[in-house]
């Protein structure tokens, strides 16, 4: 008796070639359902329709096609168990040797902006996962294929083993099947959960958090050469950095990607005027806004030209030739922008190892951040709060000018993306001093002011969290800073405010803290 293969796929890639090889090379008989059967018949391949094989028609508009004992009995039968063989014979059920199934494109459907809940529901596959799980469970007796990338491997397995398939290969395919159904069910559960989550309280009460990823590539190594690292994408469709275009340069490393993401989070704060951010080890070392992208780059670079060496540069406007020429004067790891002019691309070629990326995804924000801890992981909302000036409190006698408010807004946006304890000193919408990751706040203040030097005179200072004492205010005033922005909330806020008044400074309390660890 011929071996029996069941083919039922939504993605028809490679299907016809597989079916032809099964029939002509290995003497398989094929049963198939719905659109798959039509595709194969149109290609001249003899197929028995599932409804003809089971003696039961497809019903409910195709919702029920393969959910039948003649199908699942043939899949789940243990060929080495006499009782199973007897039951197959008694019920006129043939054992199935190969199941080729992939599922309705649920994730592709829900990725469409206008999709309705009813449309999404219709793309939830029922028969497909049932066959995949049954086949994967019974891998000792048959093979299951759930991806067209497996087809050639399966045929080669048959060719090198005289038409047989090794247990090792079948088990590997079974694992792929279970991963496929697990990811599929997770996508459905996540989508339905999001449909029902409407309030902040419901968001905080999710009892199960779903997280899975599809491998993009194995990276050369992790943070250090002795660490293994892999890059995954969420969902089946490439997005974010996975969908960015790499114009030139070496492959992206783990550290490159981490730094690029930090750069993206800064640059999306600035959507209008040309803005450039230069980062090193996820901390900004220079950020500037100006009338042209070249001027913004030059001022960001001047903010800390030493640290910019080997840094990551993110721009919110397309790169022109003049800016590309300026960037090639120093060693940089990566440059990313929403576009790059042809002349700029030519200039970058002189730095063949420089990674240049085009990414239109600067406006996207991941909904949450995740940190792994022993025994689990922590999930929090992304700190993408948009601060409103109307909510800020000017707590000093001296009032800010319109220009000073704009400067304080700029400094506040930048300090949000500096590791805590964080202090940023800016002037004319460019950073001139950054104190990052210090264990005490006044230490961060001193580092930022020392870096700024005389540029601090007339500048403003931003702090990601409150001042526990008034020493930071006094230190800033002594360096020539004219205005301070900070969240407030310290038991000794009054001391800091009093010091600011005494020294003629402006102080604004935002009421929002921006710790970053």
UniProtKB/Swiss-Prot annotation:
Pathway: Purine metabolism; IMP biosynthesis via de novo pathway; 5-formamido-1-(5-phospho-D-ribosyl)imidazole-4-carboxamide from 5-amino-1-(5-phospho-D-ribosyl)imidazole-4-carboxamide (10-formyl THF route): step 1/1; Purine metabolism; IMP biosynthesis via de novo pathway; IMP from 5-formamido-1-(5-phospho-D-ribosyl)imidazole-4-carboxamide: step 1/1. Residues 1-146 form the MGS-like domain. InterPro entries: AICAR_Tfase_dup_dom_sf, Cytidine_deaminase-like, MGS-like_dom, MGS-like_dom_sf, PurH-like. Transmembrane segments: none annotated. GO terms for molecular function: IMP cyclohydrolase activity; phosphoribosylaminoimidazolecarboxamide formyltransferase activity. PROSITE patterns: MGS (PS51855). It comes from the Bacteria. One of its GO terms (biological process) is 'de novo' IMP biosynthetic process. Belongs to the PurH family. The IMP cyclohydrolase activity resides in the N-terminal region. This is Bifunctional purine biosynthesis protein PurH. The gene is purH.
């Amino acid at each position: 008796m011929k071996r029996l293969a069941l083919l039922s796929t939504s993605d028809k890639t490679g299907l016809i070639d597989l079916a032809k090889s099964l029939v002509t090379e290995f003497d398989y008989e094929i049963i198939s359902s719905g659109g798959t059967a039509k595709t194969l018949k149109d290609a001249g391949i003899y197929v028995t329709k599932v409804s003809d094989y089971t003696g039961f028609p497809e019903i409910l508009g195709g919702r029920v096609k393969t959910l039948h004992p003649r199908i699942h009995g043939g899949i789940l039968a243990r060929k080495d168990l006499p009782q199973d063989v007897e039951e197959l014979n008694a019920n006129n059920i043939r054992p199935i040797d190969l199941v080729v199934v992939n599922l309705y494109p649920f994730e592709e459907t829900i990725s469409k902006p206008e999709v309705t809940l009813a449309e999404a529901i219709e793309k939830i596959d029922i028969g497909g996962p049932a066959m995949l799980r049954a086949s994967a469970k019974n891998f000792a007796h048959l093979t299951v294929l759930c991806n067209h990338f497996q087809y050639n491997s399966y045929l080669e397995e048959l060719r090198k083993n005289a038409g047989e398939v090794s247990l090792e290969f079948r088990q590997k395919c079974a694992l792929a099947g279970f991963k496929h159904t697990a990811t599929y069910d997770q996508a459905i559960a996540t989508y339905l959960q999001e449909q029902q989550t409407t309030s902040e309280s419901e968001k905080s009460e999710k009892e199960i958090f779903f997280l899975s990823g599809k491998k993009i590539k194995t990276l050369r190594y992790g943070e250090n050469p002795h660490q293994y690292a892999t890059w995954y994408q969420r969902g089946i469709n490439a997005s974010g950095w996975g969908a960015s275009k790499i114009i030139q340069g070496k492959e992206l490393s783990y550290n490159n990607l981490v730094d690029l993401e930090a750069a993206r989070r800064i640059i999306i704060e600035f959507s209008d005027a040309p803005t450039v951010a230069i980062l090193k080890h996820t901390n900004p070392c220079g950020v500037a806004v100006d009338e042209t992208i070249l001027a913004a780059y030059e001022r960001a670079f001047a903010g800390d030209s030493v640290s910019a060496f080997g840094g990551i540069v993110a721009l919110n406007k397309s790169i022109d030739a003049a800016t590309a020429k300026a960037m090639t004067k120093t060693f940089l790891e990566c440059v990313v922008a929403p576009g790059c002019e042809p002349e700029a691309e030519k200039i970058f070629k002189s730095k063949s190892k420089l990674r240049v990326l085009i990414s239109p995804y600067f406006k996207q924000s991941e909904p949450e951040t995740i940190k792994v801890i022993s025994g689990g992981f922590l999930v929090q909302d992304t700190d993408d709060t948009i601060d409103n000036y109307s909510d800020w409190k000017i707590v000093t006698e001296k009032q800010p000018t319109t220009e000073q408010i704009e400067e304080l807004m700029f400094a506040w946006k930048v300090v949000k993306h500096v590791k805590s304890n964080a202090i940023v000193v800016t002037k004319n919408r460019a950073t001139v001093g950054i104190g990052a990751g210090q264990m005490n706040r006044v230490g961060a203040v001193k580092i930022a002011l020392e870096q700024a030097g005389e540029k601090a005179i007339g500048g403003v200072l931003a702090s990601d969290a409150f001042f526990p004492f008034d020493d930071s205010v006094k230190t800033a005033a002594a360096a020539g800073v004219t205005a301070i922005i900070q969240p407030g909330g310290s038991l000794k806020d009054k001391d800091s405010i009093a010091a600011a008044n005494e020294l003629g400074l402006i102080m604004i309390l935002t009421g929002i803290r921006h710790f970053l660890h």
